[in-house]
A protein has these predicted regions:
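Conserved pre-motif I regulatory segment
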Residues: 1-46
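Conserved Walker A/P-loop ATP-binding site and its immediately adjacent core
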Residues: 55, 69-90
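Conserved helicase motor
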Residues: 79-81, 99-106, 114-120, 142-145, ...
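Post-DEXD/H (motif II) to motif III coupling segment of the RecA-like Helicase ATP-binding lobe
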Residues: 142-202
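Conserved interdomain linker/interface between the two RecA-like ATPase lobes of SF2 helicase motors
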Residues: 182-259
C-alpha cells in the first residue's frame, strides 16, 4: 500500500472527515416509530471539480482499513465510468479491491460497485455476510435517489461519506436525511489563485442575440425540472445555430482542443458533422456509444488526433483529462450542478502546460442564470434544502417577448489575469486582507485592486470589520446581510437591521420585529 501524498487543503479535509466520522459516531441516533437506534456518522464533502476528491476518498479508505479490523469498504457510484475511475485510483495507491462485482464470497476489504448492480445483489451480499463498515458515495448529489436511501437504511451502523462538487438539487431536496454534516473546501477562486485549478477566459452570447432570445423562449420542462430535450432540439438544432457554434470556436479557440456539450445525440452528430466538414476533427459520443469506442476516442483526443469531443451527458461527471483547452456549451440548462460540472472539466491544471488558460464558450447564455464558475455559492443552504440548485432566469426576460435580435457578437465577461503569480496559502491570506468594497454605476461589489471578487450587485457594502462586511439590497425597503472577504454570503440579506457582529455571532432584527443572535 503506497503512501498517499496530499496537498495541504486535501490533508485538512481528510482530518476534518476523520474527526466527524470518529467523534459523532457514538452520539447519533436514528428515530423510527419512536425507537432510537444507534447509527454510524455520516458526512458529505464538497470540493470543486478538479481538486482531487478521489485522492481524499482513497486516503479515507486507507484510514478506515488501518484503524478498523472488521467491516468492508463499499465505494458506490451511479455510472460504470465512475466505477472504473475509482478502481484506477485505488490501483494507483495499491489498495486491493474485489476484481469482480460477482465475487461475493471473496475475502476482500474493498468493493467498488455501481448502485444498479448493488441493488440487484444486496441480498446476496448480506447472505454472504459481506457487511460494510464504511460506505463511500461518489457524485453524492445523486444520493437523494431511493436506491441510495435504501442502501443507507439497510446499513445504518456503517459510516457514510459522500463526495461531490455540487451538494444541491433542482427540486430543493435536503440531504440531511442522508448526511449529518457538510464539509466545504475553499472556494473555486481560491484554487485558481493558488494554482490548483486553471485560470479561464469566458465569452457568452449577447443579451439580444438570436440564440439568447431563442433560449429565453423555451417553455417546456422535463421530469427533472430542466429544459425539455425535445423543445431544445427543435429550437437549437438548426444549421444557422450550429454554424454560429463553429464560428465561435474558430474565433476564440482556434488551434485548441476541447469538449462540446450537446442537447442529444442527434444534435451532437450534427455539430460533429459540421465541424468535420469545416476542418475541425470531431466525434459525437453519448452513453449508448460502446465503451470500447468511447475509450478509443478519448485516447485519440489525448494524443491530439481529435480536436473536439461532442458529448451528451457523458463528460459532465468523472471525466479526467487535464489537456482540455476549451469548453463549449451548446445546450442550456437550469441545473447549477450540470453547469458547474460542465465548465469544471476545463479547469483541471495540466502539469505539461503550466500556462494553460481554459476558454469557456457559452453559446446558450448559461452565464446569465448562474454567473461565473468561480462565483461564491451558498452550499449550506442548498445542502439543507433551503435553496434550490437551480438557475435564476433574469426578470428582464419576461419583458423581451417582442424584442428583435440585434447581433450575434459574443461578449467577454472574464479575462484571466495571466500576469498574476500563483500564491501560497500565506500569500492568499495576505491577498484577502486587501479586499475592499467599491462602487460602480450606483451598485457595490468587492475587489482587490483590479481583481473583481464580487461584481457590483448590492445597494451598499460596508467596510470590513474583521472578516465580515455588511451588505444591503433594496432601496426603499432595505434588507441586510453579511459577506466574507471571498464574497461568500455568510448571512443572507433578509434582515431588517444588523446591530453588531464578531467572528462567532451576529445580532439582527428580523422583519417580524424581534431581535435575535445568530451563530456564524
Amino acid at each position: 500500500m503506497k503512501k498517499i501524498k496530499l496537498y495541504d487543503y486535501q490533508q485538512k479535509m481528510l482530518e476534518d472527515i476523520i474527526n466527524v466520522l470518529t467523534s459523532a459516531a457514538t452520539s447519533t441516533f436514528y428515530n423510527e416509530n419512536g425507537k432510537k437506534k444507534k447509527v454510524g456518522s455520516s458526512v458529505m464533502v464538497q470540493m470543486p471539480t478538479g481538486t482531487g476528491k478521489t485522492y481524499v476518498m482513497a486516503a479515507v479508505v486507507k484510514w478506515f482499513l488501518d484503524n478498523h479490523d472488521t467491516g468492508e469498504v463499499w465505494i458506490v457510484a451511479h455510472r460504470r465510468e465512475l466505477v472504473e475511475q475509482m478502481q484506477q485510483t485505488l490501483d494507483r495507491f495499491c489498495l486491493d479491491y474485489g476484481e469482480k462485482e460477482m465475487e461475493l464470497k471473496a475475502k476482500v476489504r474493498i468493493r467498488v460497485l455501481s448502485i444498479q448492480w448493488l441493488n440487484r445483489h444486496i441480498d446476496e451480499l448480506e447472505g454472504a455476510e459481506c457487511t460494510p463498515g464504511l460506505i463511500v458515495v461518489d457524485e453524492a448529489h445523486h444520493a437523494i435517489a431511493t436506491s441510495y436511501q435504501d442502501l443507507f437504511e439497510r446499513n445504518r451502523k456503517a459510516l457514510k461519506l459522500g463526495m461531490t462538487a455540487t451538494p444541491c438539487r433542482m427540486n430543493k431536496k435536503s440531504f440531511r436525511k442522508l448526511f449529518e454534516i457538510l464539509l466545504k473546501s475553499p472556494c473555486t477562486n481560491d484554487f485558481i489563485l493558488r494554482g490548483y485549478l486553471a485560470p479561464y477566459d469566458y465569452v457568452v452570447i449577447g443579451k439580444y442575440s438570436n440564440d439568447q432570445l431563442t433560449v429565453n423562449q423555451l417553455k417546456g420542462r422535463g421530469s427533472d425540472g430542466d429544459y425539455a430535450i425535445k423543445e431544445m432540439d427543435e429550437k437549437l438544432n438548426i444549421p444557422q445555430t450550429i454554424q454560429r457554434l463553429y464560428d465561435s470556436v474558430k474565433k476564440y479557440a482556434d488551434g485548441k482542443k476541447g469538449i462540446v456539450y450537446a442537447i442529444d445525440i442527434v444534435h451532437a452528430q450534427a455539430i460533429a458533422a459540421c465541424y468535420n466538414a469545416l476542418g475541425l476533427k470531431s466525434v459525437a459520443l453519448d452513453s449508448k456509444t460502446p465503451a470500447k469506442k468511447r475509450k478509443e476516442m478519448v485516447e485519440a483526443f489525448r494524443r491530439s488526433e481529435i480536436d473536439c469531443l461532442v458529448n451528451v451527458n457523458l463528460f459532465d461527471e468523472g471525466f479526467d483529462c487535464p489537456d482540455v483547452e476549451f469548453i463549449q456549451m451548446a445546450r442550456p440548462t437550469l441545473s447549477l450542478a450540470k453547469y458547474l460540472q460542465m465548465v469544471g472539466r476545463g479547469l483541471r491544471i495540466n502539469h505539461e502546460n503550466k500556462d494553460k488558460v481554459c476558454m469557456i464558450i457559452d453559446n446558450v447564455g448559461n452565464y446569465r442564470k448562474f454567473g461565473l464558475p468561480d462565483k461564491p455559492r451558498n452550499w449550506e443552504s442548498m445542502f439543507a434544502g433551503l435553496r434550490a440548485g437551480k438557475g435564476i432566469i433574469p426578470t428582464y426576460v419576461k419583458k423581451m417577448q417582442n424584442i428583435i435580435a440585434v447581433n450575434d457578437e459574443m461578449i467577454t465577461v472574464k479575462k484571466a489575469n495571466t500576469a498574476r503569480k500563483k500564491m501560497t496559502a500565506r500569500q492568499l491570506k495576505e491577498y484577502l486582507k486587501n479586499v475592499e468594497p467599491f462602487q460602480q454605476d450606483g451598485r457595490w461589489g468587492l475587489r482587490v485592486m483590479d481583481d473583481i471578487i464580487v461584481k457590483p450587485i448590492y445597494t451598499h457594502i460596508s467596510d470590513f470589520r474583521g472578516d465580515y462586511a455588511e451588505c444591503r439590497i433594496g432601496i426603499q425597503k432595505c434588507l441586510y446581510g453579511l459577506l466574507d472577504r471571498r464574497g461568500n454570503i455568510i448571512l443572507p440579506p433578509e434582515y431588517k437591521y444588523i446591530y453588531r457582529w464578531n467572528e462567532h455571532a451576529v445580532e439582527v432584527q428580523g422583519n417580524d420585529g424581534y431581535s435575535r443572535t445568530i451563530e456564524l
